Amino acid sequence: MAAPTLGHLVLTHLLVALLGMGSWAAVNGIWVELPVVVKHLPEGWSLPSYLSVVVALGNLGLLVVTLWRRLAPGKGERVPIQVVQVLSVVGTALLAPLWHHVAPVAGQLHSVAFLTLALVLALACCTSNVTFLPFLSHLPPPFLRSFFLGQGLSALLPCVLALVQGVGRLECSPAPTNGTSGPPLNFPERFPASTFYWALTALLVTSAAAFQGLLLLLPSLPSVTTGGAGPELPLGSPGAEEEEKEEEEALPLQEPPSQAAGTIPGPDPEAHQLFSAHGAFLLGLLAITSALTNGVLPAVQSFSCLPYGRLAYHLAVVLGSAANPLACFLAMGVLCRSLAGLVGLSLLGMLFGAYLMVLAILSPCPPLVGTTAGVVLVVLSWVLCLCVFSYVKVAASSLLHGGGRPALLAAGVAIQMGSLLGAGTMFPPTSIYHVFQSRKDCVDPCGP
């Protein structure tokens, strides 16, 4: 087999990155657009709690993929990937005209269209990792780096789009008679939510087109559609050299440095027991951090930020979402292998999380409300909290890599179960019992 040309390799890396861009762009886009839509939908400040539960329920898509593999063994990942991409494109395209439509449910108005389409997109995104990655397993390992780079773009690009859009502005005009606040004056964003969702749809169409391009670019690979073993790039080609380098870089993640040199040790029951305790601790850490970042804290983000204004909420959501891929890139260069270090970072993240939870409990009158210092503190706390927890999750997952596929599977289960438990725990206090309080525009509940 002839060595692929440099142009062929570059194009393949580009298409793989664009494929990764579409993996979580839909759900990330919904999250960063919350500061814009929350003021229009009937759930109000409780909308993030509803969305947390909806995204957690998206893991039901994994059952569908499992059923597909049982009923159609050996069919590969082409059809599931195309179904995921169609659901993502159609879901975001329908969000553009329908996101603001409401309907009565149990005697109360709810944003049925928004939440239903969010569930469809969550099903697609949660299924993407278990369909996209097996497809890429038929390509040489260097292409995985391009895929994860694309996954980072799936968070960064919606954030950039949201920053360009802005969040609008609210002014309270004084009434001429008694000097009290009059009706609020709303200044809109640079473009509406519908335009944002159309732009998000364009990103997903680009990702879907990239997958079709990969199928056309690699027509000689039967493994692309059949699920068989894929061919390797020829030795001596740029891709093969990069693959060897990739394997060398991945080696520290697979075994401790103390065992890298010397003979391979035989089975040791005590070492196995130690690894089990070590692995169980890492899995517990993954479950706790996922419960906090994917369930508990997002459910109260609006209550902790909106008392300081729409801009504070907007910046906390957008910059917090951007902190996630940045932490992942940091972990690729500097990986903490110490359990004590991971515990210390987790405690630091919990400290920020506790501060944010206190702000939410004290809503609508948290400390420093109405001051610039309050805005800076709440935004910085959200960014640092999510950045620290994201780094801990990546580091813990990397340390579990040495356990092979069973360990990574257990890590995925821990992350999803933690997210589901966190979202389910916070839904009753935020959306049913209304433990956290919101406030109306241009009404000061914190005055004397």
Swiss-Prot record:
Riboflavin transport is Na(+)-independent but moderately pH-sensitive. Activity is strongly inhibited by riboflavin analogs, such as lumiflavin. Weakly inhibited by flavin adenine dinucleotide (FAD) and flavin mononucleotide (FMN). Residues 228-267 are annotated as: Disordered. Keywords: Cell membrane, Glycoprotein, Host cell receptor for virus entry, Membrane, Receptor, Transmembrane, Transmembrane helix, Transport. It catalyses: riboflavin(in) = riboflavin(out). Glycans are attached at N178. The keyword Glycoprotein applies. It comes from the Eukaryota. GO terms for cellular component: plasma membrane. Belongs to the riboflavin transporter family. The gene is SLC52A2. This is Solute carrier family 52, riboflavin transporter, member 2. It is a multi-pass membrane protein. Pfam families: SLC52_ribofla_tr. It comes from Papio hamadryas. It is found in: Cell membrane. The chain crosses the membrane at residues 14-34, 47-67, 79-99, 105-125, 147-167, 198-218, 280-300, 315-335, 342-362, 369-389, 407-427. One of its GO terms (biological process) is riboflavin transport. One of its GO terms (molecular function) is riboflavin transmembrane transporter activity.
